[in-house]
């Protein structure tokens, strides 16, 4: 009996002492001047992605001013200006999404240096490229800005307090407008007039990003899709669209299909 009582007493002592032990373990580091430092996150050396935009018409390189092109309606036209905004570009796979922070780029067909840009991403294999065609709503309402969003680039409507997301200008003999001009300034960032288009392009093969290396991908922008890809927009019927509204939305629904990711990528 004595042995049994001794065992019970010892067991009870252990239980009663447990909270004290736990408390000691919690406060001891502070008393002894020991700071608990969580394990550092594993750092990685970034790789880089260069996105190159190749402007074409039916697969052939776009030549400004001189070349005559024919749309799906048999209408001839020349292009004198093509500019469009690419915002917040990035890469993704099934578990990882990497996006350029505050990435705003104005691609200008007459300025080769504007047709590519580079940013850092985590090394790995990615399966698709994504970006916003246009400028997000927040930056349409942020007042005067710099860089690609500077109003001096002639892509901002002061009268409407918003950006022109895409601008296509030129001439066409079928245009009933003055001087046979065609002019498409597509904008609208809120409500039913919103023309912002989220673009996601599946890569034909994995896009491999290696640490401290640059991988180049080429995105084709084929403006032949502008005229008809769900919404017929013949030049003769609509030579000019320069305000937000239903026609601008129809054109935006067409031009979202202009983009395709060309096969292969180059690691440099």
Model-derived segments and their meaning:
Residues 1-44:
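Bacterial Sec-dependent N-terminal signal peptides
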